[in-house]
Amino acid sequence: MSYRESSGSFPAPDRTSLPKMFTNGDSRLRHLPPISSPPPPKRYKSESTPGSDAGHSRYYSHSVASDRTRSRQPSSAMDLYTLIDRDPVDKDPRRNARFTSNGSVATQASHASNASQISRSSPIIISDRKIPEKYPNHKENGRMYHGYRKGIYPLPCDEEEQDRLDIFHKLFTVARAEDGLIYAPHPPGSRILDLGCGTGIWSIEVANKFPGSFVVGVDLAPIQPTNTPKNCDFYAPFDFEAPWTMGEDSWDIIHMQMGCGSVASWPSLYRRVFQHLKPGGWFEQVEIDFRPRVEDKDGEPGRAMANWYSTLKHATEATMRPLAHSSNETIRNLQEAGFTEIDHQIVGLPMNPWHPDSHEQKVARWYNLAISESVQPMCLAPFSRVLSWTREQIDRIAFDVKQEAFDKRIKTYNLLHIYQARKPVEE
């Protein structure tokens, strides 16, 4: 294993704690540029930023674009197409719908027009595919939650939550170097599975960027768009912890983003992912470690932020779906599942724009917006269900955490972890 170290202000991890089980991969921490260094060159196609006022997300200006391709009404926050730049050809709202609202399973014949361009080694049969009306959403603490497999996922599925997920998607595309959508190698005509696809924004972006590929997104909540690219389908409600019937050895890429807090057994999930990948296929996982860290050696995270995280960690552990993320455990579990060529990247996410570097300020503005929209919904169900907190108690701690997140004197950051793991090629 090799560890690439560069000059920067983020502290390097303890070498003794770094995993030593890589077959052909490496772990590298992407540091913030030194304070004295000039800003890095522009690396991203999308230069839209949520306002130029660095420090408080409530001052960010949001444009609301009408988008007829979405299954939900335009909201007061960000719209699908204002969050991510798209080619003009992909903005046509007249695409044929690929997601059927009555829950019927798409058949092999429904994709016949794409058969010459997209390789499908086996049919897709989703055993968990049900009629959404059988599982009505339920209201709890003023928010709407999924009805299918009620209670196993701690976050809402309403308009506010959908906007929050889209904001995180934009954050990841900005924070990740070069190609912000996917790092794992993928051949032309790849079959790509997106686990816990949420609003479907990642699946749609990948389908548009790689029109020769075939992308399938699955999720507990049927909140995906009704009109999608022809090479993209969604199946919901679907519980990826339940048995799959989606064809073993049949996917080139399986992707998962922000799964912590929704998985009871990571070893079991990784084994299932391994079974369904083609030999030589790749699994890519993106997670945030929400444990607050500080830039200054002698500094400490804000008390409210530290208390919020430790309490949330305890509450989610009690539900058997912990939010806390461990890179060492993740890499060990991937190896034990059979993966090789494991690669691990670590990216710093400043909580607010305290760093003078222009790119890091851009990342920080998006993360400040994302975290300010996340503090309350992330703890609402765990604190009320597990700890019996009142709504007033939850709102108070959420308010205090947001105040600390907006304070540039507290140089707090979290870590974004990106993994790629390969299923060995059969000899």
UniProtKB/Swiss-Prot annotation:
* GO cellular component terms, semicolon-separated: nucleus
Asked if the Swiss-Prot or TrEMBL record annotates the protein with the keyword Nucleus, the reply is yes
Q: Which Pfam families match?
A: Methyltransf_23
Q: Locate the compositionally biased regions of type Polar residues.
A: 98-115
Which factors induce or repress this protein, as stated in its UniProt record? Expression is negatively regulated by velA. Expression is stimulated by the polyamines 1,3-diaminopropane (1,3-DAP) and spermidine.
**EC number(s) reported in the record:** 2.1.1.-
Coarsely, its chief localization is nucleus
Q: Which InterPro entries match?
A: SAM-dependent_MTases_sf
Q: Which reaction does it catalyse?
A: L-methionyl-[protein] + S-adenosyl-L-methionine = S-methyl-L-methionyl-[protein] + S-adenosyl-L-homocysteine
Gene Ontology MF term list: methyltransferase activity
The subcellular location is:
Nucleus
| Keyword line | Methyltransferase, Nucleus, S-adenosyl-L-methionine, Sporulation, Transcription, Transcription regulation, Transferase
Q: Which GO terms describe its biological process?
A: methylation; sporulation resulting in formation of a cellular spore
Q: Does the keyword Nucleus apply?
A: yes
Q: What happens when the gene is disrupted?
A: Leads to pigmentation and sporulation defects. Drastically reduces expression of the penicillin biosynthetic genes pcbAB, pcbC and penDE. Leads to a severe impairment in conidiophore formation under both light and dark conditions. Decreases the expression of the class V chitinase chiB1. Decreases the expression of the transcription factor atfA.
This molecule's function is given as:
Methyltransferase that performs automethylation. No other methyl-accepting substrate has been identified yet. Component of the velvet transcription factor complex that acts as a global regulator for secondary metabolite gene expression. Controls the expression of the penicillin gene cluster. Controls benzylpenicillin production, but is not involved in the biosynthesis of the alkaloid roquefortine C. Positively controls the expression of the class V chitinase chiB1. Positively controls the expression of the transcription factor atfA. Also regulates asexual differentiation.
* Family from the record: Belongs to the methyltransferase superfamily. LaeA methyltransferase family.
Q: What is this protein called?
A: Secondary metabolism regulator laeA
